[in-house]
Structure formats: C-alpha cells, structure tokens
C-alpha cells in the first residue's frame, strides 16, 4: 500500500517524531485487527490518547517558543526593559501536561527591584505566570464542581489536566480571585449582551439564606497549652450565606432561564441585591413589557434587602413591580402544622386542600383564613415547644399583603420560590456541605461566584472576560 507524504515546515520539525509515534500506534492496532486476533481496545484508547497528548505538548512547545524574545533590551508597551536572565527553561502547564520552554526574563530599566517580566507568559496570557489560560479555566471549572482531590483523580483517569490536588486548589482560587475582583463589571457586560428569550413574559427576583460550615479560630482554654495541643485551634461552625435568583418566566409562569447569585455569610448581601436589581434594569431596557415580581420566604431580612433596591427608581414607579409574594409553599407549610391542631386527623387533608384552593383562587382568602385561625381558639395549644396556630396567625398577620396568590395567577405569574430554593441546594449544599468540609470566607467566596457562573450557563462568557489577555506590544530596542 502506497504511503502519503505529509509536508511539515522545518520550523515545526519537532512535531515529526510525535506525529510519527501517533501514526505508529494506529498502524500497529490496524495490523493487529486485520489478523483476526484478540483486541484490547481499551488499551489502544489509552495509547492513542497518550501519543495525541505528546503531539499537543510539542505543538505548545513550538508555539510558546515563538512568543519568546532574547534581545538584551526590549520595549514592552513602550517601556524599556533590560534582560536579567537569558534563555532559561521553565514549564508551562497545558491541558495535556507540562511543556518545557526556554525564555528570557526582563525588568524595567532603572528599577533595581522592579517586577520581572516573562514575555512568553505575558503574551500567552498565562495565569500566575505558568498556567495556560484554557488550562486554568478548566481547572477552576473542575474545582467549582468537586473537591480538588476528586479533580486530581479525574484528571489522571481522563489523561487531561494531570496535576496535583494542590495545583487544582491554587489555580482555582487564583482564577476565583481574579473574577471576584471584577465581577460587577463582568456581570454588567454579560447582562448587556444577554438576549431575552422570545417567550419571556415576566421576571421574578428571589433571595434566600443557606447554612455553610465555616472554619473559625477557637479560643484557647486558660492556662498553659497541653502537650500536643493544636498550635492554631479552630472550630467548625455554621453561618448563613445568601443566594439569589433572577428568573425569566413564560406566559404560564414556568421558568425559562435563571441567573444565580451567591455570597458567603461575611459577604455583601446588599451588593448581591444591587447586582440583581441592575440585571433586572437591563432586562427591562430590552423588554419593557416584562412584569417584575419579588418572591421569597417570610424572613424580614430578605424583604428588607430586596425592598432597599426595588423601591428605588425605576422600580419606585407605580406598577413597575406588579407583585410581592411570600412563597406559596412556605405558607402551606405553616397552615399544615396549624391544620393538624385545629382539625381531627381525618379532616386535616380536606381542610388544607380547601385552604390551598381558596388562596389560589380568591384574593380575600388570606383574610378569611386568618379569621378562621383566630376563631379556632387553639392559638395557645403547644405541640412540643411550638404553637402552630399562633405561628400561622403571626405569619399571616405580618405578610397578608404578600399573599394575593389569586391575583398573581390571574396575571400568569409564578407563586413558588422553587428557583431560589434549588439554587441554595445546588450552589451551596452540593459543593460546600460535603462531609467534614469547612470554609474560609475569602476562598469560599471564590467558589460561590465561580459555581454561580457555571449554574447560570455563563461560565465561558465570564471567563473570556476575567482571563482576557492584556494587549501587549514587544519590540526589540535599538
């Protein structure tokens, strides 16, 4: 059988042996297959992946070397730099593994202790000087999904990102730090280019809290520390973090798309609400016909935070926020507990079903149910340490103006805050409440923000902006 000649430019000659090794692996497998013997295709998959990775690494080596300069003096963005280290080898980290590249290092002229510049890393947009941008992006994506040790194991199994758990941890938080530092600007840019789904008719804004295990310093007991006592005693405590959603709904109140937000307990919930309000303003600029509603549980803190933003312009205008609702299922939960006190066991379900029906179809139902709770005369009945009827009365009294579910249904608006409830579970519980896990505020904030991007289908667009390489012009100085 005749061979096909592949011409490779001399400057890319390093690829020849790697490509030949890949061809040889495939040819060997083809020859073995034609003999009709036993085939271990899984082993072939691994071999071809290894050889393909070698081709990839050689390609990176050649391309990165082309970014290098080695002149004694260069102009970098019109600033004179002199060489401080010539033709020294370093390793850049790619998706396929480490790549050795020779490069020179430079320092601004006249600055004895000025920052050292690596032209290759600068031009390639390497994160932290050695991690190639796509590699850093994917490592951060892995760590927002799972622990760094699981990411390490996955990388080794797949033959991609073959790095240690410490490297995954370091790179993910480096990317997280870079994103968090500019997240407001990036979120603004993302919402400006967002295309509102054609079928969107309303937008709901929700806010909730979720507990997160935190690592905090523990006070030492008085007296001299016991032998073997930890030098830095800590304790694992739960603090309440915040999550929010902006959800677009169709003509039936069903969710079309949700933007998810989060911040740690020591974060900035007011800033989170400001960001959500800003996104809704942009959505209204694109679609002024969208109906805006606020939807969350009955916690006063949540409503105070939302109202601080959604009573300002443009939301202060009459009719701009068409509904403010307590989550329907939180209300039913309160009523269910009260019904078990008021009614006989066989009447609990019919009574609760009646209340549900009335709330969904009659605007005055909330007042009628409140009166029924009062008339039961069982406000002081204890169930364990709770007074279910008293709690339901208090809930209805404090939130009656946020329970007009019948009016919301007539406008085809949602009445349940399931989107933010689900966000609390997927954003925090799934990733941050693993057995034995504990978090610090700064690094936890990195993961929360990165995970919110991934869950909102905004990862690539956000990383394009967060890891965007600065424009670099390098010229050899005369």
Please place each PLM-identified region on the residue numbering.
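An N-terminal low-complexity regulatory-tail signal and nearby short nucleic-acid-interaction modules
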Residues: 65-128
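Catalytic center-proximal scaffold of phosphoryl-transfer enzymes
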Residues: 1-65, 105-478
């Amino acid at each position: 059988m005749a061979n096909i000649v592949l011409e490779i430019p001399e400057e890319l000659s390093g690829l020849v042996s790697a490509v030949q090794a890949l061809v040889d692996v495939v040819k060997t497998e083809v020859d073995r297959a034609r003999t009709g013997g036993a085939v271990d295709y899984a082993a072939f998959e691994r071999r071809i992946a290894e050889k393909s990775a070698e081709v990839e690494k050689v390609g990176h080596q050649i391309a990165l070397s082309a970014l290098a300069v080695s002149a004694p003096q260069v102009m970098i963005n019109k600033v004179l730099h002199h060489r401080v280290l010539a033709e020294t080898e370093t390793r850049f980290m790619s998706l396929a593994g480490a790549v050795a590249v020779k490069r020179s290092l430079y320092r601004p002229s006249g600055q004895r202790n000025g920052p050292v510049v690596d032209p290759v890393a600068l031009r390639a947009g390497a994160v932290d000087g050695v991690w190639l941008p796509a590699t850093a992006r994917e490592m951060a994506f892995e760590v927002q999904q799972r622990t760094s040790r699981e990411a390490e194991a996955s990388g080794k199994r797949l033959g991609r990102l073959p790095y240690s758990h410490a490297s995954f941890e370091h790179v993910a938080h480096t990317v997280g730090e870079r994103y968090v530092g500019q997240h407001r600007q990036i979120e603004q840019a993302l919402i400006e280019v967002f295309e509102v789904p054609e079928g969107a008719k309303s937008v709901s804004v929700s806010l909730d809290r979720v507990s997160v295990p935190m690592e905090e310093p523990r006070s030492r007991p008085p007296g001299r520390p016991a032998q073997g006592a930890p030098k830095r005693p800590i304790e694992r405590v739960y603090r309440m973090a915040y999550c929010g959603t902006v959800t677009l709904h169709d003509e039936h109140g069903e969710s079309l798309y949700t933007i998810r937000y989060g911040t740690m307990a020591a974060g900035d919930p007011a800033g989170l609400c400001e960001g959500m309000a800003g996104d809704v303003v942009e959505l209204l600029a694109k679609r002024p016909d969208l109906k805006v509603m606020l939807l969350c549980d009955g916690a006063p803190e949540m409503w105070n935070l939302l109202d601080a933003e959604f009573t300002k312009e443009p939301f202060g205008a009459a009719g701009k926020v068409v509904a403010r609702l307590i989550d329907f299922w939180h209300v039913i939960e309160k009523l269910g507990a009260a019904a078990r006190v008021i009614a006989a066991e066989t009447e609990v379900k019919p009574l609760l079903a009646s209340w549900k029906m009335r709330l969904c179809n009659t605007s005055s139902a909330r007042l009628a149910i409140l009166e029924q709770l009062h008339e039961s005369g069982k406000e002081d009945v204890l169930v364990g340490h709770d007074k279910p009827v008293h709690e339901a009365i208090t809930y209805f009294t404090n939130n009656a103006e946020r329970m007009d579910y019948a009016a919301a249904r007539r406008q085809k608006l949602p009445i349940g805050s399931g989107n933010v409830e689900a966000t609390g579970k997927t954003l925090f519980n799934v990733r941050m409440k693993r057995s034995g896990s504990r978090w610090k505020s700064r690094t936890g904030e990195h993961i929360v923000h990165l995970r919110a991007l991934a869950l909102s289908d905004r990862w690539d667009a956000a990383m394009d902006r967060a890891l965007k390489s600065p424009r670099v012009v390098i010229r050899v100085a005369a």
